[in-house]
Structure formats: structure tokens, C-alpha cells
Amino acid sequence: MMRGGMGNMQKMLKQMQKMQKEMQKAQEELAEKTVEGTAGGGMVTVVANGHKQILEVKIKEEVVDPDDIEMLQDLILAATNDALKKVDELANDMMGQFTKGLNIPGLF
């Protein structure tokens, strides 16, 4: 009976190692993906990667008004938040297969 238990344990460990490798690969793929967040009808665009690093900020010239810097700041903030929300959605889609059935707050 002990022997069967050890075999099951080894099988479970192998499955966990396989899952760990697959998760690592998915995280590497996630880092290579990019998303765009926009605000003001595309007047401000923020590009982020899957690790929530901002890679680029694009601002259309016509939105730059020296007399209304606050509006530009709001658009940049909104576009950044939109990009980060999309990264979260992408991470949930990609990593969700590994966390299905697990209810761990803050994990993807």
C-alpha cells in the first residue's frame, strides 16, 4: 500500500513540475505581448507590456494646450489605466488555465 502512495506522489510531483514549466513559459510569452490603452478618442495612447511596464506614450499634437495641462495629464492617466487594465485581462486569459479552480486573491 505504501508503494502505491509513493507512486502517486511521484506522479503528482511530475505533474506539478510540468505545470510550473508551462506557467513559466506563459509568463515569458506574456512579457513579450503588448497592449495599447487610449484616451480622448485616441489622442493619447500608452503602450505597455505584459509585465505592466510602460513602453511608449504617444500624444497627438492637437491635444497639447499649454493653457490646459491638466486635461493632458488626465488623458495620460486615463490611457495608462486603460493599458494596465488590458494587461490584467491578458494575464487573466493567459494564466487562467493554471489557476482554474483556485481561489487565491491577488493571483492574476
Swiss-Prot record:
Comp. bias intervals (Low complexity): 9-18
GO MF terms held by the record: DNA binding
InterPro entries in the cross-refs: YbaB-like_sf, YbaB/EbfC
One CC-aspect GO term: cytosol
Domain of life: Bacteria
Extent of Basic and acidic residues compositional bias: 19-32
Keywords assigned: Cytoplasm, DNA-binding
Subcellular location: Cytoplasm, Nucleoid
Spans annotated as Disordered: 1-32
Family: Belongs to the YbaB/EbfC family.
Assembly and interaction partners: Homodimer.
Role summary: Binds to DNA and alters its conformation. May be involved in regulation of gene expression, nucleoid organization and DNA protection.
Protein name stated in the entry: Nucleoid-associated protein GTNG_0017
Organism: Geobacillus thermodenitrificans (strain NG80-2)
Organism taxonomic ancestry: Bacteria, Bacillati, Bacillota, Bacilli, Bacillales
